[in-house]
Amino acid sequence: WTYSIEAIWSGLQDCYADLRSNVKKLYDGIEIESLAAIGVSAMMHGYMPFNEKEEILVPFRTWRNTNTGRAAAELSELFVYNIPLRWSISHLYQAILNNETHVKDIKFLTTLAGYVHWQITGEKVLGIGDASGMLPIDPATNNYSAEMVEKFDNLIAPKEYNWKLEDILPKVLSAGENAGVLTP
């Protein structure tokens, strides 16, 4: 269950073409000429790591990839919190356990929802609901659990990566916060 960047954009183009067609059919031939806003629903789980050149390091791994069993089990024990196979933190830790060479080059990690948002607004953010598909959220801070972030960083410290978990995750936003504007 992996997809290329090209497949993502092809899928979005198909969705927009379908939207245009439906509007034309439903509203007596009216064509969409411009949009004031648009919403895109996408997966809140999965694994999309990018390097400092903003290039994807491995094909997009969806929430349907179930090769993260060991990582999910170990993280659930470490965090004393159930970490599902599909969460981004499970995918990241499984890549570490597998000694995947790309991990050392990660500068940004997101989900499909975060990737599409970043590409259409330039902002590396996630709404709090989608962010909870990456790592548990602390309801007191409305941010990733600082305790779990610290435990994860300590767990992988022997690997000596040049990043900390908090530095590679999208910023968490609550409902109503400005998440950016569509780029031209």
Residue ranges and their predicted role:
Residues W1, S76-Y81:
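Short glycine/proline- and acidic residue-enriched helix-loop micro-motifs
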Residues W1-V58, A73, D105, N162-K171:
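N-terminal glycine/serine-rich phosphate-binding loop of ATP-dependent small-molecule kinases
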Residues V23, Y27, L75-S76, A95, ...:
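Hydrophobic alpha-helix position signal
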Residues F50, F79-P184:
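Gly/Ser/Thr-rich active-site cleft segment
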Residues R61-T62:
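Residue-level structural signal for beta-strand termini and adjacent loop
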Residues R70:
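Glycine-rich loop(s) and the adjacent beta-strand/alpha-helix scaffold that form part
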